[in-house]
């Protein structure tokens, strides 16, 4: 599903010569009933769109990644990864608690009546000691919206730190 920007659609396929494995997968599929109808329609369209569609999606995500990396580079005292395959980046912020910052953005901060919802990174690690000062930014918005979102993060961070 991610290959076609259908994250969350929960569609995909399995190919195997192992009949026992296929039977086990079928049991799981039957207990789940089926993916939502709209997800199936979208997946069918994506699968039949050809390689041009995939190439355009890849180009768009590369563009979004470059926008995010360039905009983040203009924020002092943060560290971030330049992902090679993921459509998100983890950002280490100069704060102790990213969850508090995320809440602050939602409840106490806005720029031109806009704010940003961030994912604190601690939920993406198996150890509770990791990611407390990190957030995850996904490249799901178009380039202009990503630029604006990072500007809001920059201004919000400045106000949050004081």
State where each predicted segment sits:
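PLP-dependent class I/II
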Residues: 1-162
């Amino acid at each position: 599903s991610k290959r076609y920007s259908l994250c969350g659609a929960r569609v995909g396929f399995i190919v195997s010569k192992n009949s026992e494995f296929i039977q086990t997968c079928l049991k799981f599929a039957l207990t789940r009933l089926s993916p939502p109808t709209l997800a199936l329609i979208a997946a069918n369209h994506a699968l039949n769109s050809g390689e041009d569609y995939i190439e355009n999606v890849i180009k768009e995500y590369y563009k979004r990644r470059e926008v995010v990396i360039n905009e983040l580079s203009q924020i002092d005292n943060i560290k971030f990864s330049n992902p090679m395959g993921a459509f998100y980046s983890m950002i280490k912020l100069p704060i102790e608690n990213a969850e508090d910052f995320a809440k602050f953005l939602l409840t106490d901060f806005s720029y031109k009546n806009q704010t940003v919802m961030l994912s604190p990174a601690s939920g993406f690690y198996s150890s509770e000691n990791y990611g407390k000062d990190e957030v995850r930014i996904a490249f799901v918005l178009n380039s202009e919206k990503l630029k604006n979102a990072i500007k809001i993060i920059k201004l919000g961070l400045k106000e949050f730190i004081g």
